[in-house]
Structure formats: structure tokens, C-alpha cells
């Protein structure tokens, strides 16, 4: 399965993106800070793409 990391500090935006990516068939890991994202990348080396700070 394709895995995506979402890094967004605004919870409502992050939730919207996560819900829609999951509906599209992606496995999603999410972080609210850069530190969280780095830890998630270490724990999930199979992340294929990261989406950062969506506007």
C-alpha cells in the first residue's frame, strides 16, 4: 500500500487531508510538528511521499 506522511499544524486541515487520502486508498501517517514527523519517518521507512504545511 502507498504510505503518505502529512505534516500540518492546523488540525482541521490535517484531518481533511487525511480523511480524503484514506478514502483514495492511501495509508496515512500524520504529524503536527516537525519533531513528530521525523520520529514517524524513522518508524515508517516505507513512507513514499510527505506533504508539508498545506495552505
Place the predicted regions along the sequence by residue:
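Non-catalytic signal-transmission and effector/linker regions of two-component phosphorelay proteins
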Residues: 1-5
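Conserved acidic carboxylate
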Residues: 8
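Conserved Rossmann-like nucleotide-cofactor binding loop
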Residues: 12
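Charged docking surfaces used in two-component/phosphorelay signaling
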Residues: 15-23
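Short phosphate-binding/catalytic loops that engage adenosine nucleotides
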Residues: 26
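Acidic, metal-coordinating helix/loop segments flanking the phosphotransfer/catalytic sites
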Residues: 30-49
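The short loop immediately C-terminal to the conserved phospho-acceptor aspartate in CheY-like receiver
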Residues: 54-55
Amino acid at each position: 500500500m502507498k504510505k503518505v506522511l502529512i505534516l500540518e499544524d492546523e488540525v482541521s486541515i490535517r484531518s481533511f487531508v487525511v480523511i480524503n487520502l484514506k478514502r483514495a486508498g492511501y495509508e496515512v501517517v500524520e504529524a503536527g510538528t516537525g519533531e513528530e514527523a521525523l520520529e514517524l519517518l524513522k518508524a515508517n521507512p516505507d513512507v513514499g511521499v510527505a506533504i508539508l504545511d498545506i495552505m
